[in-house]
Amino acid sequence: MPIYPACEFPRLSDPETIETVITAVGNKEPFSLIRLGDGEAVVLGFDEDIQLQDLAYLHTHWGTEGVTLRAVAEISNDLRTAVRGADIVGIRDDILNVTIPPDLLNRSGNEIKKVVSKEFRIRQDEIERLSPMGARRLALLHRVLSTFNWGDEQQFCSAWIHWELLATGALNRILEEVRDVGLVTSRPELGELIAQRFDVRTSTVLTPDKFMEVPESGRHVPERYRTIRSELTFSKGTLVLVGAGIPGKVYCQWLKESGCVAIDVGSVFDAWVGKASRPRVLESRFGISGGDLVPRELQLGPPVNPESRRLIPKWKPTRVSN
């Protein structure tokens, strides 16, 4: 079982990843593509590295009452299983090919930020916004992924692959070739939008939204999390798009186990309905600024000219030295 101590993952190119996804969808074979970020790191690193500040971070996702040690431990175990079971795992660009001091997570927040800012592939404007706790989560992500026992057959790609699927039109082409689509999302309007746009049958399993943003939607963890598995009753071979935060990675594994093709598309769901939940990604990846503005080309609706002129990714990370 390979280990990548410097996060030197042999990643597929974006076109290779997209082709692998298209093949899995066409073959209707059990499949899971998930993406890992600093939020997943907090849960994966629960046993040995979690701190009170990490629990506070999870409060923003699931609410104060939802973040109990028992609940986090439960999801941590399930998430590890999901990571081991994924066919393709999306890895952040900025942690690749980096070696960090073994004791880094035991240092002060400011010291962690200093090391992360110097060693990780982070753009200067991001460094200026990076908090000590944000830096710690990136360091924790590196620690977790660099010590994980990966499967021999697992493949890796960019954690931004969902945006490439969207911007290149590949996701549209995939949806135009299927008849049934499952959705795991907090956005009830998506089912009808996708059905009308692509002339497909949709089935939706609803999840609560991020607690900090929409507290009235309820707590995702632990209550809803524990009931969702029984609702993932899509037929074998069905393409299921998942955008459900940290628990969504687990749902991808459960879907794969039931014979589905599960793709973690995350914030693509937000873009489809015109919500710019990742404005920094829109700006850094596509050169699009404007706060809450999502460009028309990224939203669901009638077909648009596919010439992606301003949707071509314009940024590739470079190492920044202080």
Please report, for each region that a protein language model flagged, where it lies by residue.
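Glycine-rich anion-binding loop/nest that anchors nucleotide
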Residues: 183-185, 237-251, 264-266
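Short, acidic/turn-prone active-site loops that include or flank metal/cofactor-
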Residues: 205-212, 266-271
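C-terminal functional extensions of proteins
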Residues: 247-322
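Electropositive, gly/pro-rich neighborhoods at or near active sites that engage anionic ligands
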Residues: 1-199
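Short, surface-exposed connector motifs at secondary-structure boundaries
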Residues: 175-177, 231-239
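Structural signal for conserved beta-strand scaffold positions within catalytic alpha/beta enzyme cores
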Residues: 90, 183, 204-207, 264
